[in-house]
């Protein structure tokens, strides 16, 4: 098995993964995100600000953030609108006609 050890000056203790993530958040990354992890992996200095100095649960796990930073997501196309939506848009938009007050078919001429 693997254990995680936290060392601060002369103090050392074993920590679980959740506590390790909060400690990393508190001491090394101010609200690390996918981009912060990616930058850290590339060797860039990462800094930012967080309102929760003790860490918080909204920070994703370091393992998840590192994985998402390394794997590029597939680009997905948005779904096509329904036929109903397409026909609503087509029929509800006013048609512009040059120099006429109304359509000939609407006037009965």
From Swiss-Prot:
Residues 75-109 are annotated as: Disordered. It is found in: Host cytoplasm; Host cell membrane; Virion. A motif (BC-box-like motif) lies at residues 61-70. The modification Phosphothreonine is found at residues 13, 105. Processed in virion by the viral protease. Residues 68-97 are annotated as: SOCS box-like. The modification Phosphoserine is found at residues 61, 82. Residues 68-81 are annotated as: Multimerization. GO terms for molecular function: metal ion binding; RNA binding. It comes from the Viruses. The keyword Phosphoprotein applies. Induction: Expressed late during infection in a Rev-dependent manner. Keywords: AIDS, Host cell membrane, Host cytoplasm, Host membrane, Host-virus interaction, Membrane, Metal-binding, Phosphoprotein, RNA-binding, Ubl conjugation, Ubl conjugation pathway, Virion, Zinc. Residues 88-89 are annotated as: Membrane association. GO terms for biological process: viral life cycle. It is a peripheral membrane protein. A motif (HCCH motif) lies at residues 25-56. The keyword Transmembrane does not apply. The BC-like-box motif mediates the interaction with elongin BC complex. Belongs to the primate lentivirus group Vif protein family. Homomultimer; in vitro and presumably in vivo. Interacts with viral RNA and Pr55Gag precursor; these interactions mediate Vif incorporation into the virion. Interacts with the viral reverse transcriptase. Forms cullin-5-RING E3 ubiquitin-protein ligase complex (ECS complex) by interacting with host CUL5, RBX2, elongin BC complex (ELOB and ELOC) and CBFB/CBF-beta. Within the ECS complex, Vif interacts directly with host CUL5, ELOC and APOBEC (APOBEC3F and APOBEC3G) substrates. This is Virion infectivity factor. It comes from Human immunodeficiency virus type 1 group M subtype B (isolate SC). The lineage of its organism: Viruses, Riboviria, Pararnavirae, Artverviricota, Revtraviricetes.
